[in-house]
Regions:
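Active-site-adjacent structural elements in enzyme catalytic cores
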Residues: 1-330
Length: 330
């Protein structure tokens, strides 16, 4: 992945907009985020409005470094160890919040999610914006709530857009996102670490770093981004099927005269009826994750009657991809 050189004038303009309560789409290594000043209640509420997101659905505060953690949350030895190892990077830590963190950020909960992104543009923006006051940016994915996340600036422009016709004040174009799916989210607020959302930082990596088992979160865990049953969804109805079932389903729907868009391993293409769009699924979890939202956008743009997606392998390294596909087709 090639990242465009940082445009310092654009960063300065973005800081100016954020300082007065505006909204800026910024690139991260995961997906594009819709940034607002986390200390500015009205700016954060405008983020919810722009996305059509329920205000009880908590946001992640993005910070410039691990040194910002104590300003926003009650840190723990586990949080400090993980931040040393994986920050900047695609790991979000959920901790008990400090009074400084407004309830408009946390969805009314007593916990806050924190992340330090590694994308050069995001890092430059956070350093310029944060300053000695340790300010942070809320930055949910820069798309309409529940829809496909954006992995490039074009996705943001096509969905939310820039004023006056759109909803945002600025889009920073930092190229295509490296990982393409949202960060791993780990709850450290309840005594034992638990995974709220799967991502590039895997369970095995977390367990190795912490020296303990890290299960999936239970029903009593804090509410968190990306945990709704239906999420990341294309507008076209989509189905997730095992390979043989997908072949049979494609033939049945084709016989009914439906126009199909399919994402599956290349080896299945010859076994399918004629389809409007066929996307060859990558064979590695990391490549698939980086490509996933771009592929979903392309499948949706085919204006098919149905999207069919072959289920990925049921192995630990595919957990994040499997999670996103399951929610996108729910």
């Amino acid at each position: 992945m090639t990242v465009p050189a940082i445009d310092q004038k654009a960063i300065a303009e973005a800081v100016r907009i954020l300082d007065v309560g505006g909204l800026v789409a910024m690139p991260t290594e995961t997906v594009y985020g819709l940034a607002a000043d986390a200390d500015n209640e009205e700016a954060v509420l405008n983020t919810y409005r722009a996305k059509g997101r329920p205000t009880n659905h908590p946001l992640i505060v993005h910070v410039a470094s691990a040194e910002d953690i104590p300003w926003w949350a009650e840190s723990t030895p586990e949080a400090e160890a993980l931040a040393r190892r994986y920050w900047p990077g695609p790991l979000t830590l959920v901790l008990k919040k400090k009074p400084r963190c407004g309830l408009w950020v946390t969805g009314g909960q007593d916990t806050v999610a924190l992340r330090c992104p590694s994308h050069p543009w995001a890092h430059a923006l956070l350093k310029a914006f944060g300053g000695p006051k340790h300010r942070g940016l809320t930055a949910p994915s820069a798309n309409s709530f529940g829809r496909i996340s954006p992995s490039c600036a074009r996705h943001v422009a096509d969905d939310l857009g820039v004023k006056p016709a759109g909803k945002l004040d600025m889009i920073l174009d930092g190229g295509t996102c490296e990982y393409g799916i949202e960060s791993t989210m780990l709850n450290l607020s309840s005594g034992r670490p638990e995974i709220l959302r799967h991502g590039v930082i895997t369970r095995e990596m977390l367990e190795e770093a912490l020296g303990c088992e890290v299960p999936d979160a239970g029903k009593d865990a804090p509410r968190a981004s990306g945990r709704l049953k239906s999420h990341y969804a294309p507008k076209t109805k989509a189905e997730l099927l095992p390979e043989e079932a997908l072949i049979l389903r494609a033939k049945a729907l084709s016989d009914e005269g439906l126009r199909l868009a399919v994402m599956a391993p290349e080896r299945l293409k010859a076994k399918l009826p004629e389809v409007a769009t066929f996307i060859s699924a990558p064979d590695s979890a990391l490549s698939y994750g980086a490509f996933l939202y771009e592929a979903l956008h392309e499948l949706d743009a085919a204006h098919a009657d149905r999207i069919l997606i072959a289920a990925p392998p049921s192995t630990p390294e595919w957990a994040a991809v499997d999670d996103r596909l399951g929610r996108a087709t729910a």
